[in-house]
Amino acid sequence: MNPKKLIPLLLPVMLLVATPVFAQMTLSGSVQSDILVPQDDDKIGTEHSDDKVLTNTYLDLNLGSKYVDAGARFEFLKYPLPGYEPDFKGWGVPHFYVKGHYKNVELTAGDYYEQFGSGFVLRTYEERSLGIDNALRGGRIVYKPVSGVTLKALTGKQRRYWHHNDALVSGADIEVGLEQFIKALEAHDTHITLGGSWVNKHEKTNADAIFVDATHKLNLPKYVNAWDARVNVTYGGFSLLAEYAQKTQDPSFDNGYHFGKGNVAMLSTSYSQKGMSVLLQAKRSEGMSFRSRRSMSGTSSYINHLPAFTHDQTYALAAQYPYATNPNGEWAFQAEFGYSFKKGTTLGGKYGTKLKFNLSHVRGLDYDGVKDPVADGRIIGSNGYKSSFFKMGETYYQDIDVQIEKRFSRDFSLIFMYMNERYNMTVIEGHGGMIKSNILIADGKYKFSPKLTLRCELQYQFCKGDDGDWAFGLAELSWAPHWMFTVSDMWNCGETKVHYYQALVTYSLKSHRIQAGYGRTCAGFNCSGGVCRWVPATRGFTLSYNYSF
């Protein structure tokens, strides 16, 4: 084996050996292992696996001291769980770092995660459920010359599963808190933060040869620059964030290899006081897909992140049709309102009542009369399409939901939820038309004793399109402080008449948590923060173990 490849493999061992030598150092970490013993099931359309056991297993080790931190992650993904991209498969130590910090300076060498502003021009992060780890490997410095000022500079190559893309990603960021220099602002409980970012991608033009026809090749840019400017104002319970980012010409697979520039604008405001909260935000993005390799598709190699202005649903049927941010462009709006009716009032009753309202609405851009210029292949090698800033196209997604949480006694409480949803399956998945659904949910909890609690869910989805109506039921018995028993069934009472049943047993002890189960899972999208991964249907035994120290 190449000696260079041994270094990351030996780093965890070196960290463990070093612990007793340096008594002032602390060792922390975590273990996560998710296992599936798959079984074929033609009724739900499972994918056959030649492997008897599938697992995603991670071991994180971090060594900390007063001035120096170091860490590494071992990943065993040689037989991964279903639904990940082919290159996800492998094993080794792909993530390791050393970090030094002294007074107002922090220096990192190795693999690191970073975000500038809202992530419009740079966000590297790990999300294991989606198979995302787009860390940069290189160097980063964070410097705070005075109170209220933070400077960052970085460079590196981005991870793509078990390799790193060739493009060099570099950037810088500055944030200034004006209240540190204008004392009148702080005296009036006002905070104003100004921020600015710049990111550069240096990608060799011969990395991907893109031909318009048999004899004409695109002259691809070697450098792509992106910048971001933002201001965040808070006054008491009021907050306002305005942010704008722009990207130079960046022909890629995502945008159909056109040479138009990209931009995104966001305005977000919120207000909160005791018993009430309000959030209003809007975002317009156009051509802001930004990857460290232009020919990539799927979930890998993103340098930036465009958050989805949609509510993260936790109930099974409400999360049936999640929305993923459209990288080529969209208008997105979101409004949230929360209110707590006081105890002793007509609506609050003896124990109080909580009300939550959410509205999410996403529309496409108006592409000068062309429904989808990227899909129909008209714009390769051109300057892109024309799109008026305020003009909107068809509806991509919409959900309106109302949730009421009511306690009827010291031992019994209920959550009621209604959700109306529109999901443009043709735009999001490429087929299926507009899916319209209405969802009713009841979630009740009864405490038999301080240790024994029963929670039950009943859900029904009236759905026009796709597979029709769905029903869901769940019973969860918690026996504190260690045990939890769960049974559930999701039934398609529309087209397929198929049941997706599950039974789970969970045991927790201090920092250990182990869960064993058996059942079916329905095929669908797993989404987080506007990024989605398709997960095929599965059936079999599952085992999960989590431990942190």
Q: Where are the regions a protein language model picked out?
A:
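Residues lining hydrophobic/aromatic ligand-binding pockets adjacent to catalytic sites
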Residues: 124, 131
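Bacterial N-terminal signal peptides that target proteins for export
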Residues: 1-10
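Exposed, low-structure sequence patches enriched in small/polar residues
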Residues: 32, 50, 54, 185-189, ...
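Beta-barrel outer-membrane channel/assembly domains of diderm bacteria
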Residues: 13, 21-114, 120-122, 136-155, ...
